[in-house]
Each structure stands twice: as C-alpha cells, then as structure tokens.
C-alpha cells in the first residue's frame, strides 16, 4: 500500500489548480506517494478517514484554517502541515511557492523544523450538559445572532467573578490568531510562542473597554447577563459558524494540551515578519 499525502487547495485562488498539479506530480514521480486532493474552496461532504504522511495547503491563511478545521473535526491533528502561500499576508501560510520542492525534500530527508501551535478549546454547556466541545487555531468569537444587537456578558476567571462587557461581540484568540480579527478590534499582538491567550471586546460600549491576556493555566467562563435579554448568540471558530445558542448557555475557554505541527521554512524572526506583513 502506498503512503498518502493530503493536498488541500483553494481553486478560488488564481493559479492554485496549476500549482496543485505541479505539487501532485512532484510527489508522485519522485517519492511514489498517492496524493489525495481536496478543494477547500467548494462544499465538502466527506473527509478521507485515512492516515497521511503530511498535509499540504495551497492558498492563503483562510485556506489553512479551512484545512485545519477538517483535521480537527476528524481528530487527525498529529500530521505535519506544510502551508504554501498564495495569498497576501501569510502568517500561517508562510512558505513561498518556489520553495515547495525543497520543503517536500526536507520531509523525506527527515530534516524539517516543526513549530507547535497552541489550540484553544471551548465548551458550550447548558444546565450542566455539554452541547459542543471544539478546538480553534486562530480565534473563537461570540456575537449576537440578531443583526445590530449587542451582547451583555459576564466574565469569570478561574471560577472567580471578574467583570462585565456590553459590546458587539467577544474575541478569544490564541497567539496565532492575535494578528487577525483580534488585532483589528484593538487587541494585543502575542508572540507566537507565548503560552497564553487573549480576550478582546468588539466595539465595546462599556466603561471598561480593554483587552486582557491570560496565561495558559487560566480558564475563562462567559455567560449572558441576567439583567439584559437577547434572543440568541452565535459562536464562530476560525471563522466558521458552529451554531446559535440561547442565553442560558455558558462558554468555557482554555488552552488545550494539544497542538498542531506546522512546518517552518522561514528564517525571519517574529519581529521581522510582523514588520514586513503588518507595519
């Protein structure tokens, strides 16, 4: 039986199909592996329940997040992730197109450098019963299911009552996700290897409107204030809507003991990459 490689491409990206074929041919002819191709730019109805040597993504950071969601949903998170950038910013997809052969060669020569990226875990419970238990690489967002409605939430840290927010939503982000939506909402940028996570309100209408950074040992609990009523709130994990919930639910956040294995090929420091991509 041949070894298999999972190749996730976003055909909505110009040139992705052509590059995908080049990668596929290179793997099949030089290393005699079977390439399983998935187009994350189109609806996916099934995920191959197989073991893969590694995952390659062709696209931007959005493509990486879609592919990661597939891995997380199918509990297949141990394989190395090679993310080739066809987008703009490229914090997650940071391998240049012209380097894809070198990276593949390094895998088969056992000379890859792996960066562990923390996962954020959330549990949504109602009356003590867990409704969902999910992981995110970038961020988890809670916002009203009704357009133009604010949410009123109470925050607890390690089972201790802390403060309340009135805002358009709440972003809980990992260091990986701190350069995305959280940053746009005024949140802090966390160094990639920092063992912690951040909470940032979206357009807060509260007297206290600042973000917080918590250690990996902290556990956050968010519930809806009993003083104000909203019909429902939605939760988004890495941009994907995982449903709406009534106001009697509790959201619990913590850094997971599990992580994802991203292949590193960039020699730039975090500060240099940040300067080049954001500033």
From Swiss-Prot:
Residues binding NAD(+), per UniProt: 61-62, 138-139, 149, 166, 168, 179-184
UniProt-annotated catalytic positions: 61 (proton acceptor)
Subcellular location per the Swiss-Prot or TrEMBL entry: Cytoplasm
One Pfam family of this chain: NAD_kinase_C
Primary enzyme class: transferase
Regions annotated as coiled coil: none
Family classification: Belongs to the NAD kinase family.
Function (record text): Involved in the regulation of the intracellular balance of NAD and NADP, and is a key enzyme in the biosynthesis of NADP. Catalyzes specifically the phosphorylation on 2'-hydroxyl of the adenosine moiety of NAD to yield NADP.
UniProt-recorded name of the protein: NAD kinase
Species per Swiss-Prot/TrEMBL record: Borreliella burgdorferi (strain ATCC 35210 / DSM 4680 / CIP 102532 / B31) (Borrelia burgdorferi)
């Amino acid at each position: 039986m041949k070894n298999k490689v999972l190749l996730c491409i976003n055909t909505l990206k110009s040139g992705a199909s052509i590059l995908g074929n080049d990668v596929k041919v290179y793997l099949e002819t030089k290393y005699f592996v079977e390439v399983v191709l998935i187009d994350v730019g189109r609806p996916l109805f099934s995920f191959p329940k197989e073991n893969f040597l590694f995952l390659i993504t062709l696209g931007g950071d959005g493509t990486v997040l879609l592919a990661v969601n597939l891995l997380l949903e199918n509990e297949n998170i141990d394989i190395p992730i090679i993310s080739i950038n066809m987008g703009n910013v490229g914090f997650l997809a940071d391998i240049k197109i012209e380097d894809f052969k070198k990276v593949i060669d390094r895998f088969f020569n056992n000379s890859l450098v792996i960066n562990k990226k923390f996962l954020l875990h959330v549990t949504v419970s109602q009356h003590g019963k867990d409704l969902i238990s999910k992981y995110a690489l970038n961020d988890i967002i809670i916002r009203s299911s009704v357009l133009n409605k604010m949410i009123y939430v109470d925050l607890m840290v390690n089972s201790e009552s802390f403060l309340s927010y009135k805002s358009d939503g709440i972003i809980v982000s990992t260091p990986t996700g701190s350069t995305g939506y959280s940053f746009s909402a005024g949140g802090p940028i966390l160094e990639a290897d920092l063992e912690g996570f951040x909470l940032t309100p979206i357009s807060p209408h509260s007297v206290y409107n600042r973000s917080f950074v918590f250690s990996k040992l902290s556990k956050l609990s968010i519930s809806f204030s009993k003083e104000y009523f909203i019909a429902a709130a939605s939760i988004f994990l890495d941009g994907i809507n995982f449903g709406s919930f009534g106001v009697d639910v509790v959201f619990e956040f913590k850094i997971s003991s599990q992580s994802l294995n991203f292949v590193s090929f960039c020699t730039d420091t975090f500060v240099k990459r940040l300067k080049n991509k954001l500033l």
